[in-house]
């Protein structure tokens, strides 16, 4: 059985892990980093960059660099207006009242953008394992709705991954934390404040069973919001000083975003930081600089409401779990924003104990996902995970009321049936409107789907018996069915994401993603070949200078001819000619090396020929990389 990788698909950063050698391993990406920015950039020529390469060019390409796409996942157009106002890239209204990212007229769903990030994580794992990866456990915020979970699953499918399980992020963190403590009896609180979302989950584990008692949170509260209060402050300060509005300049706003994130991070370990952005914007034709000192106290004042917003979900989670603060044995901090000192103080004050620093907030969720993957493949035995549904689910009934079938914090998988009837005489059809949320009226909750049950036998109002069944799987994804008990007619719906993507659309996007992955691979191979040629040109020119007149003219000519051919091919990026020119150059050097060896005998020839040839061979076979174990040596001939 192949490996099931664990992926933390984050708002700001993503991380991938795999269970290997009886322990979870966090895998470094091609840039050598253990976390990857959740950023996708589209650059000239159709090339696509993901992760750190995308982040590095964001300032000069703000309108085609996509970040925080997780905040758009599974949401409809009306729910993301606040997010749209914050991002420099173009978001438009697409099919089914959904947000789409517009890149040069091509509309991308949030799932497609997320799939590009997932492809990067998949490739990272494949490079590490040396084998193809097709299965994954992907984490989501505990407070993600059904449609947001479904959208995450679709993103995985588009990326070429079979999503074996969707796991709540705090639950994954608890799995990672408690793996070596699974047979102790403990109650823990996982406080997860990430880049875009906030979750609080209360868990109990013992005897290998991890049971989620309650969960609460806010899917639109996270590090992005803390960055935004700094950005808003800087914009206002510049307006006060210079009378100009930075929000009108996308490039300036991208610089502000990077500076705000950097300042927020620095203020976790320092009491003040300087924000220095030279030439931020011309005012009246004169370049202006933005230089401000931000203290930790000022930042905490700016972010006061955000920090306090974490408190109410904590209270509700504890209340739903039926526990008092003294019942909690350990508090685990997860997510980069949990490093903010004021947040840590709030957690300590609320729970009455110092939070544990025993886990890496940036990696623990991916580690937990890998642990869940190992549980599914039986690499880990004796561990049972009992998660919950974060929000109540029900249907709309007479008078626009929401009637709950499954309450929030119900352990999943779960199944519940209730019998309803018609609201009018001789009614032969009913509409089942499926809702998710905690409010009493249907209009106040999130609509996640609807379907019709037809062919009901005509009868007086209240006589027909219609059995409605809600079935939630282990991923927290819902299936609803309705059955007329008299006729036996039944209709069912598996709630899809609010994106409304059909299987055909998902398959089409998957094919496009695979095609792009192949194009990306070819582009990397092309760059490697160009670098290889560039290295060979440099080494050849260096050795020609060093050898000087020692190299016979009849041997030097073919080397120079092949070198010029390689230079021309490199400039034109003619890959076929590059291959032949490199082969000719190596052949010419080998011929020269052999003759010089024969002429100079065992002393001089043994030094000049093979050394010269080895240099070309290394350049041709190691993609232009120098071998760290090879050192240049100076030789002195003793006569």
From Swiss-Prot:
<keyword id="KW-0067">ATP-binding</keyword>
<dbReference type="InterPro" id="IPR012725">
    <property type="entry name" value="Chaperone_DnaK"/>
</dbReference>
<feature type="region of interest" description="Disordered">
    <location>
        <begin position="600"/>
        <end position="639"/>
    </location>
</feature>
<dbReference type="GO" id="GO:0140662">
    <property type="term" value="F:ATP-dependent protein folding chaperone"/>
</dbReference>
<dbReference type="GO" id="GO:0005524">
    <property type="term" value="F:ATP binding"/>
</dbReference>
<comment type="function">
    <text>Acts as a chaperone.</text>
</comment>
<feature type="compositionally biased region" description="Acidic residues">
    <location>
        <begin position="629"/>
        <end position="639"/>
    </location>
</feature>
<dbReference type="GO" id="GO:0051082">
    <property type="term" value="F:unfolded protein binding"/>
</dbReference>
<dbReference type="Pfam" id="PF00012">
    <property type="entry name" value="HSP70"/>
</dbReference>
<keyword id="KW-0547">Nucleotide-binding</keyword>
<feature type="compositionally biased region" description="Low complexity">
    <location>
        <begin position="613"/>
        <end position="624"/>
    </location>
</feature>
<dbReference type="InterPro" id="IPR029048">
    <property type="entry name" value="HSP70_C_sf"/>
</dbReference>
<dbReference type="InterPro" id="IPR013126">
    <property type="entry name" value="Hsp_70_fam"/>
</dbReference>
<comment type="similarity">
    <text>Belongs to the heat shock protein 70 family.</text>
</comment>
<dbReference type="InterPro" id="IPR043129">
    <property type="entry name" value="ATPase_NBD"/>
</dbReference>
<dbReference type="InterPro" id="IPR018181">
    <property type="entry name" value="Heat_shock_70_CS"/>
</dbReference>
<keyword id="KW-0346">Stress response</keyword>
<keyword id="KW-0143">Chaperone</keyword>
<keyword id="KW-0597">Phosphoprotein</keyword>
<protein>
    <recommendedName>
        <fullName>Chaperone protein DnaK</fullName>
    </recommendedName>
</protein>
<dbReference type="InterPro" id="IPR029047">
    <property type="entry name" value="HSP70_peptide-bd_sf"/>
</dbReference>
<feature type="modified residue" description="Phosphothreonine; by autocatalysis">
    <location>
        <position position="197"/>
    </location>
</feature>
